[in-house]
Swiss-Prot record:
Similarity comment: family membership: Belongs to the CHAPS family.
Species of the source: Saccharomyces cerevisiae (strain ATCC 204508 / S288c) (Baker's yeast)
Name of protein: Protein BCH2
Additional remark text: Present with 2540 molecules/cell in log phase SD medium.
Pfam families the record matches: ChAPs (PF09295)
Keywords linked to the UniProt accession: Golgi apparatus, Membrane, Protein transport, Transport
InterPro entries per the UniProt record, alphabetical: ChAPs, TPR-like_helical_dom_sf
Organism classification: Eukaryota, Fungi, Dikarya, Ascomycota, Saccharomycotina
Topological category with respect to the lipid bilayer: Peripheral membrane protein
Assembly notes: Component of the CHS5/6 complex composed of the 4 CHAPS proteins BCH1, BCH2, BUD7, and CHS6 as well as at least CHS5 and GTP-bound ARF1. The complex interacts with the cargo protein CHS3.
Length: 765
């Protein structure tokens, strides 16, 4: 089942009729008499201040989010455990958040909750005996705004409850549709949360979902469900920092499908296209959605250009005549325009990548004329003008872009609500403060149930009221786990674009360059929109220089401050009439870029004598990255990692490798041994804090495997200084997930872990 938990011996018992509501066809599970001895604890636990408060918080949170239309993809799933402290005769509540549980039926969560009790060494009692150990699993259905709650006492006693988050009604009957919607909801949450560090909370457990058994039938089940639900993409929400509105390509459902395909074997991509082709035939009313998603899949696969171009022409030939034949007040027209502009953007991007700038400009111009508030169309138009050396028009195009939201209000509502959770977590800040806030009574309770004999040893893994054990050492590199992990804690949440919020204040105060510190604090949580526009500006700087860009700006624009100085009675000069008013956000960007360039220039002057801390090297590297000084940025980020393993610097370095083409000149400077070293260390750091999914790491490993081959990667790791059993088994597992030869057979696990009890069924059959 799940490698998150260890194993134990089991005694076979007689099958008994379940008192719960298992669906027909599910075989009653046999009894297990577990023993806690030698069973590793590999999940976190947060001790509640008041028993049951995490469940109360979830209820109020979902009610508020749903009533205000901000539920989005919903919060992570919740596991709540009730235990009895017999010495003080009181109930103690523990909980943690989790993604990746297969909630396609009740049997999967039941098996999971059973393992939690087994992992804690608790006796699974029969229905005739009093059971004070109650475990509850909660998961949110995005589509019907329902919270499915499974209350589990034993294999004989459990109850499934469905709560309408809008009105509190809990008498809703279970149905196959609800389970299917919940499964898709879990798919979306697993992918989106794993890809977005702002959404994560300390102690979040991220299981590898259907990847664990590396079974083609499991992969296909995800594809079938996600593709089937594509017409319901509007119900899933979208990231408003990347698009003004949801489209068939700008939504969390389609994003989840595309990301999922990026970490599965190639034959799964073929299967997805086949499924979508069948849906086009069987569901003609939504065929345009399926056709556009197929085109997007082909764009990402890199070896289907001819077929993609053919399909682009087919869909445009179908949709454009329909658009031109509709009256302007037709309600259907906005969706049709969105579909067409999505396709045109793919076409324009393809032409840009193939150096056909003239045709790309004509396509992008058509797209912006159809939809003036589509960011992607304006971005590609600006890029086309830059590449064709029409720099004045590029500036005008950038100025015409819709200024996207700094933050997504739906996501932010959930993040703000989870600040409640942060009362349970206290970052170590490089051991600069006491980060265990539990009472002696609570520590004694933990020592008893976790079988710790040394209180000081236990306190090293307690962060506030959250305990973070990882006893199996799966993915362990000792130097990472015993140093950076304990000093920094999990790197997640808002303002996690650099380490300022994760190191001691004393280390922050050692940063000598005040401008560097100021800009680093301002960019701890920078919007996606600003990052994209800066890329265009830095491309202009690389081509014509900063001073020439400033001169071009003054030729094209009049600044708002100067415009306000003009009296209304004054006649505008011919020169001013020919200029555009520079948008305020665009004007501010020039000031930010100027400050970053000043830092870059200063660093070049002080390069020979610079003596920086690890934090300063990171902040300088990220600043140089913002101004596209890639060679020096890479050098600074690597130096930061040498001073102290820095997962943020590591992520950026690996992202260079991931996003660059193999033929790129800068790409040739990357040593694959260095890339592999960084990747393995990042995997180890993140798996220490329960990220067993690691989409980004799988994407990097997939590219690395295409360059080296899996056997060379395995041999390099075995012969490396970190070739410890804990990490080598993780890499082997990830390579198996990506293997091109995994057609239909499910592969047995090869990791050196004890056998699971015979009564525990796999999560994915």
């Amino acid at each position: 089942m799940s490698f998150l938990w260890g194993s134990t011996k089991s005694k076979k018992g007689k099958n008994k009729k379940a008192a719960g509501s298992l669906p027909s066809g599910v075989v009653p599970q046999q009894r297990v008499k577990p023993t806690r001895k030698n069973v590793p604890i590999d999940y976190p636990r947060t001790l509640e201040k008041v028993h049951g408060e995490s469940l109360i918080f979830r209820t109020s949170l979902l009610s508020e989010l749903v009533s205000t239309g901000k539920s989005g993809i919903g919060p992570p799933d919740l596991i709540h455990c009730t235990e009895l402290d017999k010495f003080h005769d009181e109930k103690i509540g523990e909980f943690f958040y989790i993604t990746g549980i297969d909630a396609s039926s009740v049997s999967m969560p039941i098996a999971f909750l059973k393992l939690i009790k087994w992992n804690d060494g608790k006796k699974l009692k029969s229905a005739s005996l009093k059971n004070d150990d109650i475990t509850t699993y909660c998961t949110f259905n995005i589509f019907q705004k329902l919270d499915i709650r499974l209350r589990y006492e034993s294999e004989d006693v459990y109850q499934v409850n469905i709560v309408d988050c809008l009105n509190g009604n809990n008498e809703i009957p279970l149905s196959d549709l609800i389970w299917e919607e919940t499964f898709v909801s879990c798919c979306i949450r697993s992918v989106i949360i794993n890809s977005d560090f702002e959404r994560k909370i300390p102690g979040l457990v991220e299981l590898p979902f259907v990847f664990e058994n590396r079974c083609a039938s499991d992969y296909k089940r995800v594809i079938d469900s996600l593709c089937k639900f594509l017409p319901r993409f509007l119900e899933c929400g979208w990231d408003s920092t990347k698009s003004v509105y949801a489209t068939i390509l700008n939504n969390y459902l389609t994003e989840s499908l595309l990301v999922f395909l990026s970490i599965t074997p190639e034959f799964i991509t073929d299967y997805a296209i086949q499924v979508l082709d069948n849906l086009m035939t069987n569901d003609p009313s939504n065929s345009r959605y399926y056709a556009i998603v197929i085109i997007s899949i082909m764009e990402r696969s890199n070896d289907r250009d001819v077929e993609m171009i053919k399909r682009i022409h087919e869909i445009l030939d179908l949709l454009l005549p329909v658009l031109y034949g509709l009256p302007s007040d037709e309600p259907y027209i906005s969706d049709l325009i969105n579909c067409i502009t999505d396709v045109l953007s793919i076409q324009a991007r393809f032409l840009l990548n193939n150096n056909d700038y003239e045709l790309s400009l004509s396509i992008s111009t058509l797209a912006t004329n159809l939809s003036s508030d589509n960011f992607e169309s304006w971005y590609l138009l600006s890029k086309g003008y830059i590449f064709s050396q029409q720099y004045d028009k590029a500036l005008l195009s950038i100025n015409s872009m819709p200024c996207l939201a700094e933050y997504d209000i739906v996501k932010q509502a959930q993040i703000n609500a989870f600040k409640f959770y942060m009362n349970y977590y206290k970052a170590p800040l490089c051991h600069s403060r006491e980060h265990c806030t539990m009472t002696s009574h609570e520590l004694n309770h933990l020592m008893n149930i976790m079988h710790y004999e040394n209180e000081l040893e236990l306190k090293t893994i307690i962060f506030g009221r959250t305990v973070m054990p990882n006893e199996s050492k799966y993915g362990c590199i000792e130097e990472i786990w015993n140093k950076s992990c304990l000093e920094l804690g999990p790197i997640c949440g808002p303002q996690s674009d650099n380490l300022i919020n994760f190191v001691s204040q004393q280390e922050v105060n050692t940063v000598g360059d005040m401008l560097l510190l100021k800009r680093s604090k301002e960019t701890r949580q920078e919007s996606w929109f600003i990052k994209q526009v800066r890329l265009l500006l830095m491309e202009l700087v690389a081509r014509i220089g900063w001073n020439a860009l400033l001169q071009l700006r003054s030729d094209v624009f009049v600044m708002e401050s100067k415009f306000k100085m003009i009296e209304s009675s004054d006649k505008l000069s011919t020169e001013l009439r020919q200029k555009r008013l520079c948008q305020r956000w665009f004007d501010a960007m020039f000031l930010d870029v100027y400050e970053d360039l000043s830092i870059s220039t200063s660093s070049q002057e002080n390069k020979a004598t610079a003596k920086y801390s690890g934090l300063e090297w990171e902040l300088l590297g990220l600043t140089l990255l913002r101004v596209s000084d890639l060679p020096d940025a890479v050098a600074c980020l690597r130096t930061s990692i040498l001073a102290r393993f820095d997962p943020i610097s590591c992520h950026h370095l690996l992202n260079f490798y991931l996003t660059m083409d193999f033929n790129d000149e800068f790409m040739r400077r990357f040593d694959v041994d260095i890339i592999l070293d960084l990747l393995v260390k990042l995997i180890s750091f993140r798996i220490r804090f329960y990220d067993r999914f690691q989409i980004f790491s799988l994407q990097v490993l997939r590219k690395l495997e295409g360059q080296l081959g899996s056997e060379i990667i395995k041999n390099k790791i075995i012969n490396s200084p970190y070739g410890q059993a804990g990490i080598t088994s993780v890499i082997d597992y990830m390579l198996e997930c990506l293997s091109k030869n995994r057609n239909e057979a499910c592969l047995a696990y090869e990791r050196p872990l004890p056998d699971l009890p015979s009564t525990i069924k796999p999560l994915a059959d």
